[in-house]
């Protein structure tokens, strides 16, 4: 965020709150519920309304699967950081797919390949550069 001249405070707060609705088990619309929760919380703390708007935009648009465009550099930073998190926990993804989901080898490979491909494709170029080696390595393992 800093390297891209984004408002670091907005990105940090959005990153802390972007998945907050998952606590209540809301996965499908957690971006919508999370943005509403963030607005209520930050308003109750007397936070600046312009920054609240930016934070809500970040949270609403952080999921690539929703089709909600990331209009600000802060939103792009959050979406990229969210996608990058998968590359910090590669073994966890394998465990989840094979142990928790019980996938067979080929089905699991396809799920993992798809997840990492989607994550990589939604990143801004600066983020891609940071995880490129891991992305290439995961794809080689899955060949």
Q: What do the PLM-derived regions correspond to, one by one?
A:
Residues 8-26, 30-34, 54-64:
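His-Asp-centered metal-binding catalytic motifs of divalent-metal-dependent phosphohydrolases/nucleases
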Residues 1-11, 37-45:
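Alpha-helical phosphate/pyrophosphate-handling elements in metalloenzyme active cores
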Residues 32-39, 56, 109, 113:
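An amphipathic alpha-helix signature
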Residues 1-5, 17, 65-143:
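Divalent metal-dependent phosphate-bond-processing catalytic cores, especially two-metal-ion Mg2+/Mn2+ enzymes
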Residues 20-23, 41, 45, 62, ...:
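Alpha-helix C-capping/helix-to-loop hinge sites
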């Amino acid at each position: 965020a800093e390297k891209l001249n984004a408002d670091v405070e907005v990105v940090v707060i959005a990153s802390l709150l972007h998945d907050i609705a998952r606590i209540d088990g809301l996965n499908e619309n957690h971006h919508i519920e999370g943005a509403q929760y963030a607005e209520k919380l930050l308003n109750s703390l007397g936070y600046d309304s312009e920054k609240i708007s930016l934070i809500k935009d970040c949270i609403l648009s952080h999921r690539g699967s929703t089709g909600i465009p990331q209009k600000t550099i802060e939103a792009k930073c959050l979406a990229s950081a969210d996608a990058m998190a998968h590359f910090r926990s590669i073994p966890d993804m394998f465990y989840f797919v094979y142990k928790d989901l019980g996938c067979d080898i080929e089905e699991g490979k396809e799920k993992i390949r798809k997840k990492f491909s989607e994550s990589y494709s939604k990143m801004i170029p600066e983020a891609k550069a940071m995880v490129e080696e891991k992305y290439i390595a995961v794809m080689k393992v899955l060949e």
